[in-house]
């Protein structure tokens, strides 16, 4: 059983480093330019013992790469820098994060939740109801991605 809840931006860095960006020098540099933006919201997943096992961040942001992928008049939130510790994958931590993110985004008035999904995560996002809305593209130092979106 996993619980997802709001966390501070600084609480995302350790898991981002361990799960998403181990090639970076330290957790302190595992930030993104919009972490402290006005509409930024950060989410952590915690196991029954209270250990922080998953993370994502949400931003009130349209896609610069594929601006036409979602209806222009629809409000959107972007799910970004999501990951879970390898030992909890397939056990519900990621699903708890996405459910929380979708509910929170809907409460903010969003119609869509979208992400730049890593190729390895395509099956997970598809199981969560996301659909592909772009062709594939390459993200430097990370690998193949596609834009995916969930209608809220």
Segments (PLM) and residue ranges:
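Conserved catalytic-core motifs of GNAT/GCN5-like acyltransferases
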Residues: 114-116, 131-147
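Conserved beta-strand in the GNAT
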Residues: 44, 51-62, 66-70, 78-83
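Conserved GNAT acetyl-CoA-binding A-motif
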Residues: 98, 105-118
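Conserved N-terminal entry element of GNAT/NAT acetyltransferase domains
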Residues: 1-8
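Short hydrophobic/aromatic beta-strand element in the GNAT-like acyltransferase core
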Residues: 28-29, 40-44, 55, 81, ...
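Active-site rim helix/loop that mediates acceptor-substrate recognition in acyltransferases
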Residues: 16-49, 63
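Conserved active-site tyrosine of GNAT-family acetyltransferases
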Residues: 16, 125, 130
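Conserved acetyl-CoA pyrophosphate-binding loop and the N-cap/start of the following alpha-helix
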Residues: 88-100
């Amino acid at each position: 059983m996993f619980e997802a809840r709001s966390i501070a931006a600084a609480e995302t860095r350790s898991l981002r480093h361990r799960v998403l960006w181990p090639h970076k020098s330290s957790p302190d540099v595992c930030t993104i330019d919009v972490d402290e933006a006005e509409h930024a919201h950060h989410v952590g997943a915690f196991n029954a013992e209270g250990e922080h096992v998953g993370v994502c961040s949400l931003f009130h942001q349209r896609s610069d790469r594929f601006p036409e992928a979602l209806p222009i008049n629809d409000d959107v939130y972007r799910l970004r820098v999501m990951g879970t510790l390898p030992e909890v994958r397939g056990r519900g931590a990621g699903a708890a994060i996405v459910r929380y993110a979708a509910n929170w985004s809907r409460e903010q008035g969003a119609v869509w939740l979208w992400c730049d999904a890593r190729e390895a995560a395509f099956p997970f996002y598809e199981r969560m109801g996301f659909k592909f809305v772009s062709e594939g593209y390459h993200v430097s130092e990370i690998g193949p991605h596609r834009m995916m979106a969930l209608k809220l």
